[in-house]
Amino acid sequence: MNFLVTGAAGFLGSALANTLVKSGHQVRGLDDLSTGDPARLSSAVLFTRGDVQDRPKLWTLLQDVDCVYHLAARVSVQESVLYPREYNQVNVGGTVSLMEAMRDVGVKRVVFISSGAVYGEQKDQPVSERAIPIPASPYAVSKLSAEYYVQTIGMLWKIETVVLRVFNAYGPGQPLPAAHAPVVARFLRQATGDGSLVVYNGGHQTRDYVYVDDVVEGMAAAAEAPGVDRRIINIGSGAETSVLNLADQIIRQTKHGEILKTPHEEGGVSRLCADLTLARQLLGYRPQYSLAEGLRLTVERDPRFQRVAVP
């Protein structure tokens, strides 16, 4: 098959693009490189630097494409609180621009990578796709809005649409920005640097941490799975882990670091875990990596965390 991957130089986008070319597919990648790194990509990926709001460029890249994976987005919950307009412009405006270009060219399927963050605070866990979203940040609002645009434009113009709500992905190569770094990568950096793993408000908040290879498996399956048009599907590990337990596991894995608890309230919902029933039924999705195994592989495969020898 011929694929276009937007956000192809990012953490998940590059892992997906590289997996697709290894499987024998033709892959075009698009990324504005605001945060991505094209060095992540296999030489077999036909990479173009550009913006998803550049319609003429999209028209060219979409020629003869069978399926689009749309990952291009701003992805920091905390940053979105500071810059909601930019998140709306990129995450919503960019998605609409891409869907219009797909309509113009006649591409028949899109897999949109959304986020478990759209659910917000939910009483019932693990959370299923039937739950009514209660987005609690501009990032979550932008992803939910983009979902509606994808599904509505797809319905009107006969484009098959699949929405994957990915939970807290982690793994080797995950970006470590100076501010608002993802918690797994941040804790690993702190531990391997003999620092303190700062845990807020007791560390009782829970998340579903899913290893990058499992996420890629779910994304790859969505391109050809039957009966998934206009479906929303969770992609996670199905395991609920507290931040405190995550910190403990990272200290055990690296044999370095210590936990520093602070009463400061960190933003975010109290609990979030994916119900994977629909993913199993529709995609045959079964995550293979426990958190302990995923952390071991992350340390083993990411040179940033190899100051500490892996036993």
Regions found by a protein language model. Give the residues of each.
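Residue-level signal for the nucleotide or nucleotide-sugar donor/cofactor binding architecture
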Residues: 53, 82, 90-93, 130, ...
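A short beta-to-alpha transition loop/helix N-cap that caps and shapes the active-site region
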Residues: 36-37, 120-121, 173, 243, ...
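NAD(P)-dependent short-chain dehydrogenase/reductase
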Residues: 125, 148-208, 212-221, 238, ...
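C-terminal substrate-binding subdomain of Rossmann-fold SDR/epimerase-dehydratase oxidoreductases
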Residues: 192-311
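N-terminal Rossmann-like NAD(P)+-binding domain of SDR-like oxidoreductases, especially those catalyzing
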Residues: 1-167, 289, 301, 308-311
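Alpha-helical elements of Rossmann-like donor-binding domains used by nucleotide-donor carbohydrate transfer enzymes
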Residues: 15, 57-60, 64-67, 97, ...
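Residues that form or immediately flank small-molecule/cofactor binding pockets and catalytic motifs
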Residues: 52, 132, 171, 204, ...
